[in-house]
Design a protein with these regions (language model features):
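Noncatalytic, helix-rich "gating/capping" subdomain that lines the substrate-entry/channel surface
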Residues: 1-82, 86
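Second-shell loop/turn segments in exported
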Residues: 69-81, 94-99, 173-174, 195
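Short amphipathic alpha-helical coiled-coil/interface segments
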Residues: 80-95, 109-120
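Charge-dense polyanion-binding interfaces
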Residues: 124-140
Length: 197
């Protein structure tokens, strides 16, 4: 593709990704094509929900820090630490009792169980949003600055070791998962609240 084609694609992609934050005619066009036609969504999301999604996407850990302060006391993490420790003990006992597994395979499984990472509730170190400039009344500009902020953050990590303490989702996300690549299980604070836990 030539440079003009690439520029046109980048401009179209920018408008498409920013459409939910633009004036209503862009929101409507985006909904009609992306959400209704392509995804079958029967109605557009309300404006306030789009706003919450935008802020959550840009400053998820800042919101998460407040969420944790309000809804995730230290004893909740301690209870979960104990529960997971008991699960690991039970898994270790079951592993030792397996008669179909060779001694070499058991040794590998034991090592994997012992090396099992655990993230409970929230990151130990919160992300710093101090360099992100937010201006009241400038949603589009804020979105562009947020993109730049994220780009700079990712670029600053190039060539450096992977941060094993970084979380893939925010504390206020209702989810839990096992990451097989990192051999870790993650329980964000929100999944450890009633009615889920």
């Amino acid at each position: 593709a030539d440079l003009d084609t690439l520029k046109a694609w980048l401009a179209a992609d920018l408008v498409d990704s920013m459409a939910p934050l633009l004036p209503e005619r862009f929101v409507t066009a985006h909904y009609e094509f992306r959400e209704k036609f392509m995804s079958g969504q029967p109605e557009p999301r309300e404006r306030w929900k789009r706003g919450v999604s935008f802020v959550e996407g840009v400053m998820g850990e800042a919101i998460g820090r407040d969420y944790v302060a309000l809804y995730f006391p230290p004893d909740a993490k301690a209870k979960m630490d104990e529960l997971v420790a008991n699960v690991k003990l039970a898994m270790g006992a079951r592993l030792e009792a397996l008669d179909w597994m060779s001694p070499e395979t058991k040794a590998e499984a034991r090592a994997k169980l012992e090396g099992f990472g655990l993230k409970i509730g929230h990151p130990e170190k919160w992300r710093d949003y101090g360099a992100l400039e937010v201006r009241e009344g400038d949603v589009f500009g804020n979105a562009l600055r947020a993109r730049r902020f994220e780009w700079d953050f990712r670029r600053s990590r190039l060539g450096k070791p992977v941060d094993k303490h970084e979380w893939g989702m925010t504390p206020q996300t209702v989810n839990a998962y096992y990451n097989s690549v990192k051999n870790e299980i993650v329980f964000p604070a929100a999944i450890l609240q009633p009615p889920f836990f």
